[in-house]
From Swiss-Prot:
It catalyses: uroporphyrinogen III + 2 S-adenosyl-L-methionine = precorrin-2 + 2 S-adenosyl-L-homocysteine + H(+); precorrin-2 + NAD(+) = sirohydrochlorin + NADH + 2 H(+); siroheme + 2 H(+) = sirohydrochlorin + Fe(2+). Its EC number is 2.1.1.107, 1.3.1.76, 4.99.1.4. In the N-terminal section; belongs to the precorrin-2 dehydrogenase / sirohydrochlorin ferrochelatase family. Pathway: Cofactor biosynthesis; adenosylcobalamin biosynthesis; precorrin-2 from uroporphyrinogen III: step 1/1; Cofactor biosynthesis; adenosylcobalamin biosynthesis; sirohydrochlorin from precorrin-2: step 1/1; Porphyrin-containing compound metabolism; siroheme biosynthesis; precorrin-2 from uroporphyrinogen III: step 1/1; Porphyrin-containing compound metabolism; siroheme biosynthesis; siroheme from sirohydrochlorin: step 1/1. GO terms for molecular function: NAD binding; precorrin-2 dehydrogenase activity; sirohydrochlorin ferrochelatase activity; uroporphyrin-III C-methyltransferase activity. The gene is cysG2. This is Siroheme synthase 2. S-adenosyl-L-methionine binds at residues 225, 301-303, 306, 331-332, 382, 411. NCBIfam families: cobA_cysG_Cterm (TIGR01469), cysG_Nterm (TIGR01470), PRK06136.1 (NF004790), PRK10637.1 (NF007922). PANTHER family: SIROHEME SYNTHASE, SIROHEME SYNTHASE-RELATED. The active site is at 248 (proton acceptor), 270 (proton donor). Residues 216-459 are annotated as: Uroporphyrinogen-III C-methyltransferase. It comes from Pectobacterium atrosepticum (strain SCRI 1043 / ATCC BAA-672). GO terms for biological process: cobalamin biosynthetic process; methylation; siroheme biosynthetic process.
Length: 459
């Protein structure tokens, strides 16, 4: 992060603006909106500046720049068309440790001005750090079209209720639930927009009198196969509302960072052959945190109901009487195959898909004869350690040794690597791969050369 995003309270604080033209005028409008006490320094000023001075909204100083103008100033903006003057202003401000913005010169500025979406008191700022101002502007325009115009009224109304909410609800979790109900209350938003104060009062009293369930809850969320962009919108919504996030090894840092900054994160990572936290302790942890009134997101890689032991955890919560819900995720078979250019079904090559756990032992009672049937795709989860056993059992059942296979390592991520070969080479390929990996077996793998689109490391 090259710049720390902050919002400055400049009301009644002296600020200096150097420049008297159109660019300086735009900056002056922002400072006026912020309630700053503005001194503007230039040799000449446009009509708007003269009008502002006439209305006593700011003070004009007709002169060349003098560093003495910086005395007792909180903030300065250099907005002239003379680079030497701008540099002089910046150097003088830096000597005095005063924040200075030089318009269109981020490399010569101690702070930069973002693109702003103004829904006062709600403010949204977008910045590219000066590297791509057009992109920042386009994002601002996009956000302007999405954010309702009455958000400011809703935010201001929330400010009026803050002290009452603190008195009414002792627990932070109860307050958060109240605010979330208020902010998604469509009828209240409409009443505020139409300035129907009587209706606003009625709806507000209903919110305060409605019982708030103080119990916590657990939401089982599938994080998808790796790429943070594959997290569902509903999964993102629950993640950003969670007080506590209990997550596994396969959940990426990028997805974790989408949670609230004040949310507690608890790692219970598990991998084949190693369990850092036993399953019964995970179950008890979820119950304990929910009973304490927290909103808990149990975040699992892929889809929690496909080899994720999600059902086991929910069975425990159901018996314990803890409320729960489920947000499905994109399972590894779907995500990794798509990012590798391997369709799981194809009219000419595969009429079905089998998802199989790779945690198979030599005495496991799998129906290997049905797995060796033609025109289907086999997807083995967590199968690296048993790859040679899988290879041998399928060949025993007359599945041709030449059937294409692929091992997808770190699928959908920037570290994705795909190892391709034939069934007879599966055990050998597995020795070159590491977890997490997915094994795909079937003629559809042969389409990868034509359909591959995602940049990865191929072997």
């Amino acid at each position: 992060m090259d710049y720390l995003p902050i919002f400055c309270q400049l009301h009644d604080k002296p600020c200096l603006l150097v420049g008297g033209g159109e660019i300086a005028e735009r900056k002056a409008r922002l400072l006026l909106d912020a309630g700053a006490v503005i001194t503007v320094n230039a040799l000449d000023f446009n009509d708007q500046f003269r009008a502002w001075e006439k209305d006593a909204q700011l003070t004009l100083v007709h002169s060349t720049f003098d560093p003495a103008l910086l005395n007792e100033v909180w903030l300065v903006i250099a907005a002239t068309d003379n680079q030497d003057v701008n540099n002089h202003v910046y150097a003088s401000a830096s000597e005095r440790r005063i924040f200075c913005n030089v318009v269109d010169s981020p490399e010569r500025a101690s702070f930069i001005m973002p693109s702003i979406i103004d829904r006062s008191p709600l403010m949204v700022a977008v910045s590219s750090g000066g590297t791509a101002p057009v992109l920042a502007r386009l994002l601002r325009e996009k956000l302007e079209s999405i954010l309702p115009q009455n958000l400011g009224k809703l935010a201001a109304f929330a400010g009026e209720l803050r002290s009452r909410v603190k008195i009414r609800f002792c627990k932070m979790s109860a307050r958060r639930r109240f605010w979330e109900k208020l902010f998604v209350h469509d009828r209240l938003a409409q009443a505020l927009a139409s300035e129907d104060r009587e209706r606003v009062q009625q709806l507000t009293e209903l919110l305060f009198s409605a019982p708030l369930d103080d119990r916590g809850e657990v939401t089982l969320v599938g994080a998808g196969p790796g790429d943070a962009g594959l997290l569902t919108l509903k999964g993102l919504q629950h993640l950003q509302q969670a007080d506590i996030v209990v997550y596994d090894r396969l959940v990426s840092k990028e997805i974790l960072n989408l949670s609230r900054r004040d949310a507690e994160r608890i790692f219970v990572g598990k991998a084949s052959g190693y369990h850092s936290v036993p399953q019964d302790q995970i179950n008890q942890l979820l119950e304990e945190k929910a009973r304490a009134g927290h909103r808990v997101v149990r975040l699992k890689g892929g889809d929690p109901f496909i080899f994720g032991r999600g059902a086991e955890e929910l069975e425990y919560l159901q018996q314990a009487g803890v409320p729960f819900s489920v947000v499905p995720g994109i399972t590894a078979a779907s995500g990794c195959s798509a990012y590798s250019g391997i369709p799981l079904t194809h009219r000419d090559h595969s009429q079905g898909v089998r998802l199989i756990t790779g945690h198979v032992k030599h005495d496991t009672d799998l129906d290997w004869s049905s797995l060796a049937a033609e025109k289907q795709t086999l997807v083995f989860y967590m199968g690296l350690q048993q790859a040679e056993h899988i290879q041998n059992k399928l060949i025993e059942q007359q599945l041709p040794e030449t059937v294409p296979v692929a091992i997808i390592e770190n699928g959908t991520s920037t570290k994705q690597r795909v190892l391709s070969g034939q069934l007879s080479q599966l055990g050998e390929l597995a020795q070159q791969a590491s977890s997490p990996s997915l094994i795909i077996i079937g003629n559809v793998v042969g389409l990868r050369e034509k359909l591959s689109w995602f940049s990865d490391q191929t072997a």
